[in-house]
Regions:
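Catalytic histidine-centered segment of alpha/beta-hydrolase-like enzymes
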Residues: 92, 223-232
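Post-His helix in hydrolase/transferase enzymes
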Residues: 229-243
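Acidic catalytic loop of the alpha/beta-hydrolase fold
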Residues: 194-201, 225-226
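Short glycine-rich catalytic loops that host catalytic nucleophiles or stabilize transition states
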Residues: 83-86, 217-224
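Short, proline-enriched alpha-helix->beta-strand connector loops that line the catalytic pocket
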Residues: 49-51, 183-189, 212-216
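Serine-dependent carboxylesterase/thioesterase catalytic core
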Residues: 54-59, 63-64, 68, 74-186, ...
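Flexible, membrane-associating and regulatory peripheral segments of lipid-active enzymes
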Residues: 1-54, 67-71, 76-78, 250-259
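Short alpha-helix in the alpha/beta-hydrolase fold that links the catalytic acid
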Residues: 69, 201-208
Length: 259
């Protein structure tokens, strides 16, 4: 989950602070993890006035990783739910199809035509596959990804026996599908990435590089992989992103930063 800083990364003061913060966040997440194991209870609520937000956790994780982000979005008046996909999933594409059904159910229940998705790590890739390959751009207004291996990651090669891990390697079949043309994709994509994200190897692989997508890549400084889902600066930036326009006027990869 990103506890260690690779030896190739300079041990600057910023890197050490990011590593220390990651340890603190990891400890807090361990305490909260049991609270997110079960699916949340879905309650009937009045129709939403804005697109609901659906949160997607990462590999071997659960909805507890979003406790702070969810609280902040809810305080801003958004209807927020989390989708716990199976920790035993072996194929990202199957999970994306399950997500499609979950989105349809959420739209029907809230009376909204579109939703916003926020995915941490693998969850962002599940959301992107749904948007690009399963027609999800007709339902997803904005896709926000936090530390997602859009170009694949080479971390932990000893885990290659796991089919899902092989799918997030550079040039995998899934990533090749996502690199294919996606003309007319109607979803705005915002990718948050950090140079101190030890899970994303090489650094910058969490950027989205695709000529057909409306993309903004946001660099976050001094934050590790797990902290991307919990740091106040990132949470504030995600909240602003979801309050912004549904689709920018131009496509391409632009870069912003969060200090």
């Amino acid at each position: 989950m990103g506890l260690l800083i690779p030896m190739s990364m300079p041990l600057s003061g910023a890197a050490l602070r990011a590593g220390a913060l990651e340890v603190v966040v990891f400890g807090g997440h361990l305490l909260l993890y049991p609270t997110g194991v079960c699916q949340e209870k879905v309650t009937t609520r009045p129709p939403a006035t804005r697109p609901p937000v659906l949160l997607l956790h990462g590999f071997s994780d659960n909805r507890s990783v979003f406790v702070l982000l969810r609280r902040a979005l809810g305080a801003g008046g958004r209807h927020v739910e989390a989708y716990n996909y199976s920790p035993f999933t072996l194929d990202l594409r199957v999970t994306a199809r399950h997500l499609a059904r979950r989105v349809e159910e959420l739209c029907e229940r809230t009376g909204q035509e579109r939703v916003d998705l926020v995915g941490h790590s693998l969850g962002g890739l599940v959301g992107r596959y749904y948007v690009q390959r399963l027609g999800g751009d007709t339902r997803v207004r904005t896709l926000v990804t936090l530390g997602t291996p859009h170009s694949g990651t080479r971390v932990a090669p000893f885990m290659d026996a796991h089919p899902l891990i092989r799918q997030i390697r550079p040039d995998s079949e899934v990533l090749t599908e996502l690199a294919a043309p996606a003309p007319g994709c109607a979803t705005r994509c915002v990718a948050f990435w950090s140079e101190f994200d030890a899970i994303m190897t090489p650094a910058g692989t969490a950027r989205i590089e695709h000529p057909d997508l409306c993309v903004e890549n946001v660099q976050v400084t001094g934050i590790g992989h797990l902290a991307l889902a919990a740091h106040p600066a990132v949470i504030a930036a995600v909240r602003r992103t979801l309050e912004g326009p549904g689709l920018a006027a131009v496509t391409g990869s632009d870069t912003a930063s969060v200090a």
